[in-house]
Each structure stands twice: as structure tokens, then as C-alpha cells.
């Protein structure tokens, strides 16, 4: 109980919006607590841990997005998603809600009006000392009036490394104009070659921009 309570307390303002649709009979916080305890915890008989894959930091009837990416680069988390406006009740003007939870430090950073659904991208600045920590990321949406909220989705985090040196193995993530994610994972080639491959899609100075080039 205390584990879930501590997690939700850390993101209480986010939960207040994220569970607004369920705040008529009981508080948004209590609604989130109820869901988490029923659906998003693991227990070995003596210890309870949160299943962050099943956890929902928002829940509601608004159409969510079903795929997206989260990329850590130069002190910020870059979020990209497919704009599914027009499907169900999803609208271009829906507001993106971003959340990054630092599991090691047990603190969170979030933005409940980071971008429009139609933007397809947003960024969230992070503290410099978070780079080596385990980060949990969630993406959700709410309607303009805030009355409808989507179920959140957890995004796995990719790390975009600097393209420097001559022979190191790298994992480089490139966000290209098609809004698809291309990953060169642990390539056994020199970094300048990777940089040349990426230059087809991106100027090297723009590798950490979340917005696809036009």
C-alpha cells in the first residue's frame, strides 16, 4: 500500500487531471489508488512492487495513441507519436500530457499541456543528474476542456548518444521525416560512418530535436 501511495503522491497534480473522469464518486487520487492496487502491483507475499507497464497515470474515455517513442538526448526527453486525430473522439487540439518518473530518485517531472495531439512531438527538460537513472515515461492526452482523458501508455526509453570518436560502437537513434524511428543498434562500424548514414535524414546539429524536419 505504502509503495503505491508514495508513487501517486509524487505525481498527485498529474493524477488530479489524469483521473478527473472518475472523481465524481471519490477523489481522483483514490480512484488511481484503487486501480493501481487491483491491476498494477506485484507481490511475493512479503513485498509489493509496482508493475509500471500496467500502471495508468491517467484513465478515461478519450482515444489514446497506440504507438510512440521516448528518446533521452542532451538533458531532455523527446516524445514522438502518430497523430491519430479523427479516429474515435481524438481531436487535433487534444493536449499531450507527458510524465517522466525517476525510479531511482522517486521523483517525477511532467507537463500536462506539452503540445497538441496534431503536433506529433514534444519535449520535456530533465535534470542533468538523471542521465544514468532508471526512467519511466508515460504519454497521455486530455481534451481541451479537460473533461475527457485518455488512458496513458508507457513508452520504452531509447538513448541518443553523441556521435564522437572514431571506432566506438554506438547506438544511435534518428528521427526522420517519415516520423518512423530508425535505430542503428550497436553497429560495429566507425562513428563517422554512422554520422554519414544519419546525414541523409538529419543535420548533425539537429539530432536531438524532437520535431521532424520539414
Regions found by a protein language model. Give the residues of each.
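Short, low-complexity, charge-dense intrinsically disordered segments
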Residues: 165-203, 207-210, 214
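Long, polar/Ser/Thr-enriched low-complexity segments
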Residues: 1-60
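Compositionally biased, intrinsically disordered low-complexity regions enriched in proline and serine
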Residues: 20, 36, 102, 111, ...
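Context-gated lysine
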Residues: 9-12, 20, 26, 38-39, ...
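Short intrinsically disordered, low-complexity coil segments enriched in acidic
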Residues: 1-4, 162-167
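Charged linear interaction tracts used for macromolecular binding and regulation
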Residues: 34-163
Amino acid at each position: 500500500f505504502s509503495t503505491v501511495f508514495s508513487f501517486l503522491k509524487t505525481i498527485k497534480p498529474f493524477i488530479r487531471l489524469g483521473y478527473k473522469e472518475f472523481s465524481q464518486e471519490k477523489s481522483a487520487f483514490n480512484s488511481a489508488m484503487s486501480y493501481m492496487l487491483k491491476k498494477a502491483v506485484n507481490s511475493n507475499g512479503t513485498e509489493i512492487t509496482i508493475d509500471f507497464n500496467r500502471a495508468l497515470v491517467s484513465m478515461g474515455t478519450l482515444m489514446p495513441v497506440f504507438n510512440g517513442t521516448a528518446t533521452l538526448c542532451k538533458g531532455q526527453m523527446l516524445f514522438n507519436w502518430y497523430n491519430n486525430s479523427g479516429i474515435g473522439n481524438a481531436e487535433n487540439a487534444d493536449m499531450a500530457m507527458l510524465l517522466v518518473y525517476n525510479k531511482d530518485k522517486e521523483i517525477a517531472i511532467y507537463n500536462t499541456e506539452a503540445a497538441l495531439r496534431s503536433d506529433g512531438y514534444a519535449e520535456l527538460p530533465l535534470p542533468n543528474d538523471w542521465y544514468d537513472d532508471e526512467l519511466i515515461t508515460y504519454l497521455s492526452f486530455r481534451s481541451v476542456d479537460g473533461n475527457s482523458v485518455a488512458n496513458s501508455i508507457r513508452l520504452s526509453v531509447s538513448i541518443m548518444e553523441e556521435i564522437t570518436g572514431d571506432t566506438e560502437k554506438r547506438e544511435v537513434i534518428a528521427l526522420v521525416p517519415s516520423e518512423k524511428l530508425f535505430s542503428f543498434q550497436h553497429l560495429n562500424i566507425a562513428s563517422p560512418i554512422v554520422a554519414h548514414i544519419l546525414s541523409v535524414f538529419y543535420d548533425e546539429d539537429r539530432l536531438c530535436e524532437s520535431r521532424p524536419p520539414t
